[in-house]
C-alpha cells in the first residue's frame, strides 16, 4: 500500500497580504513534517506537497482555516516515497508565469469538462485539441491528435496563440495541462481575445488518468509531473528511473 499522499492545488484569489503568509505557512510545514513547494502571489496560491495521511489532514485543515482558502481542493496521488526533499514557500509575481497582464481566471476561465465529458468531446473532429504544456512534456506523452505548440516555457504560449490561432476565434478549442492551472490562464487569456468556445479539462491530465479506464483512454505515453517522480503512467505510478538517465538531466537544465 502506498502511504505517501502527494497533493496539488491552486486557487486564483486576490491576496494583498501574500508576502506575510510565507513565514507562517513554512513554519507549519516544518512543524508537521510536510515537504513540497507552495507559491504565493497577489493573484493567488499554487503548490504541491506530500506527507502521510495524518500530516496531510493536519496541513489541509491549517490552510483551510484561512477563510479565503476554505474551499481549497486538493488533488491527491500516491507513492511509496516522498517526491519532495524539503519544504519551500516562494513569493512570485504570478502563481503560474505566463507574463500577460490583466488576465483573471477567477471570473473568466473556459468551460470545465469532466474527464468523461472530455473523453467524448475531443473525439469530435471539429474540435481543436491543444496541449498547453512545454515541448518536453508533450514529447513524453499527450492525448491522441493533440496539437503541440512547441514552446519551451509557458511564457511563449501567448505568442503561439497570436501566430497560429487568432483567426480561429469561432472554433471549439479544448485545452489541457497536468493539473489544470495553466489552462485556467490560457482559457481566460483567449476569452479576453474574443475566442467564443474555449474548454478545459477539469483538474487536468491526472484527473483524466484516474477517471478513465486505461483500456478506453485516449492518452498516449507518460505524464510529466513537477516533482522527483518525473513522470507517471496511466495507473499514476512513477516511471522514473525507467526513463533514460539523461532525460532527467536535460529536464533540469531547462
Curated annotation (Swiss-Prot):
User: PROSITE patterns given for it?
Assistant: RHODANESE_3
Per UniProt, what is one GO molecular function of this protein?
A: oxidoreductase activity, acting on paired donors, with incorporation or reduction of molecular oxygen
Q: Which residues cross the membrane?
A: none
Catalytic center at which residues?
177 (cysteine persulfide intermediate)
Enzyme Commission number? 1.14.-.-
Q: What class of enzyme is it?
A: oxidoreductase
Name of this chain's protein:
tRNA uridine(34) hydroxylase
Species for this entry:
Legionella pneumophila subsp. pneumophila (strain Philadelphia 1 / ATCC 33152 / DSM 7513)
Amino acid at each position: 500500500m502506498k502511504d505517501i499522499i502527494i497533493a496539488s492545488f491552486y486557487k486564483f484569489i486576490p491576496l494583498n497580504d501574500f508576502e506575510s503568509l510565507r513565514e507562517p505557512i513554512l513554519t507549519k510545514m516544518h512543524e508537521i513534517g510536510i515537504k513540497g513547494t507552495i507559491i504565493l502571489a497577489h493573484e493567488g496560491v499554487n503548490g504541491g506537497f506530500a506527507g502521510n495521511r495524518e500530516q496531510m489532514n493536519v496541513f489541509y485543515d491549517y490552510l483551510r482555516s484561512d477563510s479565503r482558502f476554505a474551499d481549497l481542493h486538493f488533488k491527491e496521488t500516491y507513492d511509496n516515497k516522498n517526491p519532495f526533499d524539503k519544504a519551500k514557500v516562494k513569493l512570485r509575481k504570478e502563481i503560474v508565469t505566463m507574463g500577460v497582464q490583466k488576465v483573471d481566471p477567477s471570473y473568466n476561465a473556459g468551460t470545465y469538462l469532466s474527464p468523461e465529458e472530455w473523453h467524448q468531446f475531443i473525439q469530435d473532429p471539429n474540435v481543436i485539441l491543444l496541449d498547453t504544456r512545454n515541448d518536453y512534456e508533450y514529447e513524453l506523452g499527450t492525448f491522441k491528435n493533440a496539437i503541440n505548440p512547441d514552446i519551451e516555457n509557458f511564457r511563449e504560449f501567448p505568442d503561439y496563440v497570436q501566430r497560429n490561432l487568432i483567426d480561429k476565434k469561432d472554433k471549439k478549442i479544448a485545452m489541457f495541462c497536468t493539473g489544470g492551472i495553466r489552462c485556467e490562464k490560457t482559457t481566460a487569456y483567449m476569452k479576453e481575445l474574443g475566442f467564443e468556445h474555449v474548454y478545459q479539462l477539469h483538474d487536468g491530465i491526472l484527473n483524466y488518468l484516474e477517471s478513465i479506464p486505461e483500456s478506453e483512454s485516449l492518452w498516449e505515453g507518460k505524464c510529466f509531473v513537477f516533482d522527483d517522480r518525473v513522470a507517471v503512467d496511466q495507473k499514476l505510478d512513477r516511471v522514473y528511473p525507467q526513463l533514460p538517465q539523461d532525460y532527467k538531466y536535460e529536464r533540469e537544465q531547462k
